[in-house]
Amino acid sequence: PPPPPPPPPPFCHPHAAIRDQPRSRGLGDVYKRQSYECVYKRIDTGKSKIDAWGIFVGKNNPTLLSIHGGPAAQYGFNYFDEFQTYAEAGFNVIACNPRGSSGRGHKFLRDVCGNKWGVNDTHDVVTAFKEMVKEMKISNKNYGIMGGSYGGFMTAWVISHYPKMFKSSVVERALLNWETMVGTSDIGITFPEMYLLEKFDKNINLYRKKSPITYANNIIAPTLIIHSENDYRCPIEQGEQLFSNLKRRGVESAMMRFPAESHELSRSGQPVHRKQRFEAIINWHKKHLT
């Protein structure tokens, strides 16, 4: 009988020419970095119980508060490259799921609608942040705040209502003016009424009352505005309004515009733009917090 066939090579590839080429190092070999562990706590804010997370780098390091979009979204027990990147840059990171977030039932999700918008969620975010700073025993009082979309709204809202609390802010792809969003956003017909519970032409004063741009004159924190030029969800005019206000009043500010990018820049934008975004955020916070 013929001899048995030789065993297959340890690394099989359908194309032998490719198989026999020297294998390049993987990204994991080139970019090995420390992974930072999260601490978790459910915080009683006095009005709700909020899930909060923190990445601790050091008690003498500055701290960033990151606010998710949505608001019907959530942070969870998963690896998030953004937080790891900021930790690697030397920042403690704190995040939470305030009322309005998903994952806690319909009542929790809708507990920011109408006149509750900017009230219940702000209470939860600010209270959770303060409690996590205590929990993590952070002594450095240099705090930065950031967020995108609804998180950008909340960032602008917090720095206009708590103007001395944060020394640095980054407002990304934000909802800043309900009044103009109605006529420019791809969800301008439905989203405002879904959350403000009033029609635009019936209660324009509510739309103005719940817009960060109304309170922009209170902002004193150095603010970086990041926006994509092809953002149809929160059109770039939203960011331009805030930038114009800050520049006009002499508040330290900058606006970074990304051409040919959408609302999804941070998640699916061109790699070069995503890298530039990370660098801009880190450099801005380092400039004002370290």
Predicted segments with their positions:
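Short, small-residue-biased leader/transition segments that mark boundaries at the very start
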Residues: 14-31
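Cap/lid segment of the alpha/beta-hydrolase catalytic domain
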Residues: 33-135, 141
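Long, low-complexity Q/N-rich tracts
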Residues: 1-10
